[in-house]
């Protein structure tokens, strides 16, 4: 797919990102803006094995290093990091104002509790 318009090479993704960023809707609420940001950034996810230089025989399926591992956005005013991962698309947040940075120990937060995402069956809700 390298060389095709809209491929997954960094220059192609950058040009598309500029175009999408210039057409983003102005939104008043930060949560709406974060969802809009994720909708835009999802256009640039790299599928497993599609990265430049990837080879299907060498693709690291376990580590998935050739694909988009996480997507993040910031609310700089409220100091909140938002992200979702390739294992769970639910948006999560880390509120930096709630973390004590005065200690000497490094704090760790797991990106995923479990590397899975459930699918909720809503068939019985049909009317």
Language-model features: where?
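C-terminus-biased signal that marks the final domain/tail of proteins
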Residues: 1-127
């Amino acid at each position: 797919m390298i060389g095709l318009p809209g491929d997954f090479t960094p220059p192609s993704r950058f040009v598309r990102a500029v175009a999408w960023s210039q057409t983003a809707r102005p939104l008043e609420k930060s949560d709406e803006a974060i969802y809009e940001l994720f909708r835009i950034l999802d256009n640039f996810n790299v599928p497993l094995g599609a990265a430049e230089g990837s080879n299907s025989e060498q693709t690291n399926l376990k580590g998935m290093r050739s694909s988009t591992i996480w997507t993040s956005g910031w609310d700089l005013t409220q100091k909140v990091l938002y992200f979702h991962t390739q294992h769970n698309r639910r948006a999560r947040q880390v509120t930096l104002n709630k973390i004590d940075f005065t200690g000497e120990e490094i704090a760790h937060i797991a990106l995923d509790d479990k590397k899975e995402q459930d699918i909720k069956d809503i068939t019985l809700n049909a009317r």
